Amino acid sequence: MGPSGTAHRMRAPLSWLLLLLLSLQVAVPAGALAETLLDAPGARGASSNPPSPASVVAPGTTPFEESRLPVFTLDYPHVQIPFEITLWILLASLAKIGFHLYHKLPTIVPESCLLIMVGLLLGGIIFGVDEKSPPAMKTDVFFLYLLPPIVLDAGYFMPTRPFFENLGTIFWYAVVGTLWNSIGIGLSLFGICQIEAFGLSDITLLQNLLFGSLISAVDPVAVLAVFENIHVNEQLYILVFGESLLNDAVTVVLYNLFKSFCQMKTIQTVDVFAGIANFFVVGIGGVLIGILLGFIAAFTTRFTHNIRVIEPLFVFLYSYLSYITAEMFHLSGIMAITACAMTMNKYVEENVSQKSYTTIKYFMKMLSSVSETLIFIFMGVSTVGKNHEWNWAFVCFTLAFCLIWRALGVFVLTQVINWFRTIPLTFKDQFIIAYGGLRGAICFALVFLLPATVFPRKKLFITAAIVVIFFTVFILGITIRPLVEFLDVKRSNKKQQAVSEEIHCRFFDHVKTGIEDVCGHWGHNFWRDKFKKFDDKYLRKLLIRENQPKSSIVSLYKKLEIKHAIEMAETGMISTVPSFASLNDCREEKIRKLTPGEMDEIREILSRNLYQIRQRTLSYNRHNLTADTSERQAKEILIRRRHSLRESLRKDNSLNRERRASTSTSRYLSLPKNTKLPEKLQKKNKVSNADGNSSDSDMDGTTVLNLQPRARRFLPDQFSKKASPAYKMEWKNEVDVGSARAPPSVTPAPRSKEGGTQTPGVLRQPLLSKDQRFGRGREDSLTEDVPPKPPPRLVRRASEPGNRKGRLGNEKP
């Protein structure tokens, strides 16, 4: 059965499971979920006071009779809240699995749209069964429990360098752009309300300004859900996402300001100036609280090297503490948790272990994904109901003014900011920024938070906000991918940055900093260099411990290098390590080379067992984990070293073949079988023996395997053939046990089974044993997958009697 059949078999049980969960949700009493999300304290009060044993009366008995032990009981109110929350999370997770079973569906329709449609389906079922409005999501649940994980995930994994390089543009769009949209939409709607034919004359100016402030909030949840799939370039992504993240703080400040003005009977000039001061205090105060708690978290994790288990806990506790502390002082919780996450990513990551860091990433991605799914589902569920008021003029003009003022704001503000940017934003980038102004959960929660006593047309505001949210999420979210492809907007580069690229980038940063210093211009390179010096001198010494953990790959590499150094010291090789000062003293030595069969065997062993690199599939997704920088650098180091080893072995093999082809013992197929070469082609090489004698010999022999290929590979050309004997793993020349050289009258020895000759009294001894060459722990792994091969043949020197005939005439080619 093919993949389609397997997918069909997987979808059928999943469909039945979804139907079962839907039936469980419908079977829940009508007010159960409302008690969970709207009146949780009341539900807890009802379930936390169970009846006393004296008041429990079995069916069919009087209060004076003794009750018996029941066999089976059902106490749903006791577990109602956690049971329903678990069911909703399970339903949302299964819905996401079902979407991704159809691979083409998430590429056409964003996941946020699909989740809203699931919520609409559930809300319609609940409304049809109970004939009541489905429960709406409580705003405290959204702001205190569902929104912080999403903002924490976005701030922790945000690329910090592009964010700070575009910080001025982001603040320009977030602050000035939000004020532009809020005031523009509010004044335009107030002008529409003055037309008596529309029946909107009871909506005041402050109410329109309040509605304009909440409807102008670009939602980071919706932006992340859409822009993570289209893979625009990093600069454009940072601008849209940074604006959506920071303008929420501006929106909340304006919302609270206009809400307070609406509840006042008279507004004085002092109140206006207090509102402007409150605007800056809320934003700056939230950032300071986040940075302070981020520093405390880094200082705490400095002392957790003995208790690794609780390291991930501090990341989530301090980040959430920054959010609720800012909310407690009526500051910006979004700014606080974003600043805390970015601070912890810089310092805490270097204190925690690699396993703790992986746990943090997985758990953070899981929390943000679940929160985002629940938000979109409850947006769909809360849409169905009777709490709506429809007015064609107000709804249609609200949608039109949102699009018009968003486009005008982006194009006008970009013309101003391009004067100060090194790389100006193009028309395509401006169009995508204006097109990416998606509304979402922030606007939805704020409009439900309006008090009905102060705003009698609250239902009309809810209806208009839902229309704007659905239009931007569905229409703009679905069409933005083909629009990006049609405009040929620059996409993101998925290629991971190599170590050399990072080194060159840092080099260019220092060069640009020096140029700015010479010119007397204090740009962002100057301030970045100043902060780095301050960070290295004070902050890192205070917040980061000295022996911070490293990657497991780097640790293994370090252990291998230490083991290699110990083996060199034990075998006496460390004393003869050459230095650059002693390169001129190295004497060129001609040693015997290995046979081609032995070279092939060594190359096969090295390619199979030396530095086995674990491959990882890289993909860019918000809910997937990105590759760690230290892991990528260590992996690249090992890959380069493995490549260099193989290249050096390949080069040695090619040199061996060239030398064998140039010796007198080579057999030329163009000559007769027993014909000797001319004297001009016979090259005699003088080789000094241990006793000082020299003899003619060819260059067929053993191979030099460099135990430290790096030390030899980077030598200059004039010294590339010079190496100390301590670095060589070679076979010693034949050592005569009886005498220094066999007499000429010795008859040729009989050939062995392998095809070589065996000389009595002549031994071949390795300089290093097998354990010293490959290590005791590697012996089994090196020979596990390699088939056994015959040992290398023992060959006489060409100068010995009877040997040249055997090599030229009897030896197999």
From Swiss-Prot:
A matching Pfam family: Na_H_Exchanger
GO cellular component assignments: apical plasma membrane; plasma membrane
Tissues and organs where the protein is expressed, per its UniProt entry: Predominantly in small intestine, colon, and stomach, with much lower levels in skeletal muscle, kidney, brain, testis, uterus, heart and lung.
Subcellular location: Apical cell membrane
Cell membrane as UniProt keyword: yes
Keywords assigned: Antiport, Cell membrane, Glycoprotein, Ion transport, Membrane, Sodium, Sodium transport, Transmembrane, Transmembrane helix, Transport
Designated name of the protein: Sodium/hydrogen exchanger 2
Alphabetical list of InterPro entries matching this protein: Cation/H_exchanger_CPA1 (IPR018422), Cation/H_exchanger_TM (IPR006153), NaH_exchanger (IPR004709), NHE-2/4 (IPR001953), NHE_CaM-bd (IPR032103)
Polar residues biased stretches: 687-696
Biological process per Gene Ontology, one example term: regulation of pH
Family in the record: Belongs to the monovalent cation:proton antiporter 1 (CPA1) transporter (TC 2.A.36) family.
Enzymatic reactions: Na(+)(in) + H(+)(out) = Na(+)(out) + H(+)(in)
Membrane topology recorded in Swiss-Prot or TrEMBL: Multi-pass membrane protein
Region Disordered, annotated ranges: 649-709, 736-813
Transmembrane segments: 108-128, 139-159, 170-190, 210-230, 238-258, 279-299, 309-329, 362-382, 393-413, 431-451, 460-480
Gene Ontology molecular-function annotations: potassium:proton antiporter activity; sodium:proton antiporter activity
Glycosylation sites: 351
Regulation: Li(+) activates Na(+)/H(+) exchanger.
UniProt feature, compositional bias: Basic and acidic residues: 649-661, 770-781, 797-813
Glycoprotein keyword on record: yes
